[in-house]
């Protein structure tokens, strides 16, 4: 019965935000005048590149660090395990509902709390290189958990757009966030490639690792804290639930 009441409350909450706004519209320029837009865009900018780094560079990492090719049996098993762990994100979208039921928070506040929880999981990626000296399975598991956390984070950050903006503006805001995420991804992938070339050429040393492994450790450090930085800035820009009301 309580769950049914909470579902009704969730629907009522959403309806009150958008009740009189369906016929109103927001210009593309207006979108950039709201802190909520910048909060969403920054969250995407900081984190989208991490996901694509995990996907794009994982085979190269296994080859560089462990001399394991993904065309081999072990390499395929490792990549399969990484992607299988990432599928744990299926349960990530349920956490805000659990928080709402237990605390009575509004959906936006519950989503932000869930995102904070997810933002801590990528810190495990910091252990990828140190534990990689024991077995290649450890970094694969750490990266897989980081990937699962990203998808859980991503599902919730997209939902915050619907919490804060009227229906007529959701597509524009989502597009702005997607663009910011694309730019962030481009910067991270390009920078990672340049860093790996530099690290290999100069035999860079970082935290006891030399050459490309040192470069990977640097990028893993960046990826691991990106979500916490993104969340902190989002929270600073929009500390409390504040829907956009079009006049």
Model-predicted regions and their roles:
Residues 1-8:
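Short, small-residue-biased leader/transition segments that mark boundaries at the very start
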Residues 9-23, 101, 105, 237-247:
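Intrinsic disorder in cytosolic terminal tails and internal cytosolic loops
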Residues 29-94, 146, 150-154, 158, ...:
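Extracytoplasmic gate region of multi-pass secondary transporters
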Residues 67-85, 109-113, 137-138, 172, ...:
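Loop-to-transmembrane helix entry
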Residues 71-72, 110-113, 194-225:
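A membrane-interface helix-boundary motif in multi-pass transporters
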Residues 89-90, 162-201:
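A late C-terminal transmembrane helix in Major Facilitator Superfamily
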Residues 108-156:
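C-terminal transmembrane helical hairpin of 12-TM major facilitator-type secondary transporters
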Residues 125-131, 216-247:
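Multi-pass alpha-helical transporter architecture, strongest
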């Amino acid at each position: 019965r309580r769950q049914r009441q909470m579902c009704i409350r969730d629907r009522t909450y959403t309806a009150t935000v958008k009740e009189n706004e369906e016929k109103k519209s927001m210009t593309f320029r207006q979108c950039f005048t709201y802190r909520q837009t910048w909060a969403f865009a920054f969250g995407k900018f900081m984190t989208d590149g991490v996901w694509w780094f995990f996907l794009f560079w994982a085979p190269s990492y296994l080859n560089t660090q462990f001399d394991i090719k993904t065309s081999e049996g072990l390499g395929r098993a490792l990549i399969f395990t990484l992607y299988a762990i990432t599928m744990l994100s299926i349960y990530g979208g349920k956490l805000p509902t659990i928080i709402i039921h237990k605390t009575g928070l509004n959906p936006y506040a519950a989503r932000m709390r869930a995102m904070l929880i997810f933002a801590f999981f990528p810190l495990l990626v910091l252990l990828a290189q140190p534990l990689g000296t024991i077995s290649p399975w450890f970094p694969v598991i750490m990266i897989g958990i980081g990937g699962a956390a990203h998808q859980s984070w991503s599902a919730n950050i997209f939902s915050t757009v619907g919490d804060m903006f009227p229906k007529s503006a959701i597509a524009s805001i989502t597009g702005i966030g997607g663009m910011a995420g694309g730019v962030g991804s481009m910067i991270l992938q390009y920078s990672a490639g340049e860093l790996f070339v530099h690290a290999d050429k100069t035999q860079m040393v970082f935290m006891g690792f030399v050459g490309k492994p040192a470069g990977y450790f640097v990028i893993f450090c960046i990826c691991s804290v990106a979500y916490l930085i993104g969340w902190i800035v989002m929270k600073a820009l929009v500390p409390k639930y504040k829907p956009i009301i079009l006049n």
